[in-house]
A protein has these predicted regions:
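Alpha-helical bundle segments that constitute or directly flank the non-heme di-iron/ferroxidase center
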Residues: 2-18, 27-65, 82-87, 146-169
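Active-site cofactor/substrate anionic-group-binding motifs, chiefly glycine-
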Residues: 68
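Active-site-proximal alpha-helical scaffolds that flank and shape metal-associated catalytic sites
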Residues: 74-169
Length: 169
């Protein structure tokens, strides 16, 4: 499948996302703060998923060897370049995650929680325990666990399966 075919096949889904009903429900700065304080985990996790794709579809190991599909490798690496080191409005290279944190601070959203959670993800073996211990609501914990599970090989880490939506919300 070519990049053009992929983009075409995603066009309808992209339109649905652009016109999602959630946007109409964000009526105040407080609503935006609340949304951002949970959505930030999706922004962070996107990079984890992207790095998993980069690991699988390009070569990030030593010794280096050419990727089996250099068109896909280039596409992934271009996305990684932009996500990891795009330029903000001041011309400073920052990751999109860091830019999102800056935007959160502009609207006085709480960034200390996500910085604490992500900051404790020092190694793969500690992630499951950190997710359990973190001050996250159940939906946030399940989101992180399920998406990390899809981006980290099972032989590297054991993450909890999503829990029923009850308990700490």
């Amino acid at each position: 499948m070519s990049i053009e075919n992929l983009e075409h096949s995603l066009k309808e889904v992209r339109e649905q996302l652009k016109n999602h009903e959630l946007y109409a429900q964000l009526d105040s700065v407080e609503d935006i703060r609340t949304f951002m304080e949970s959505h930030v985990y999706a922004v962070w996790d996107f990079m984890s998923l992207l790095k998993a794709l980069q690991r699988e579809l390009t070569c990030t190991d030593l010794p280096w060897k050419p990727a089996s599909d250099t068109t896909v490798a280039r596409f992934i690496n271009e996305i990684v370049l932009e996500e990891e080191s795009d330029f903000n409005e001041e011309g400073v290279a920052k990751s999109h995650f860091e830019m999102y944190l800056d935007a959160m601070e502009e609207v006085n959203a709480n960034t200390s929680k996500v910085k604490g959670v992500i900051g404790n993800f020092g190694n793969l073996e500690a992630i499951a325990g950190q997710i359990k211990k973190a001050d996250l609501n159940l939906a946030e914990r399940n989101f992180l666990a399920s998406l990390l599970r899809s981006s980290i090989p099972e032989n590297r880490i054991s993450l909890p399966r999503p829990l029923p939506l009850e308990g700490k919300n």
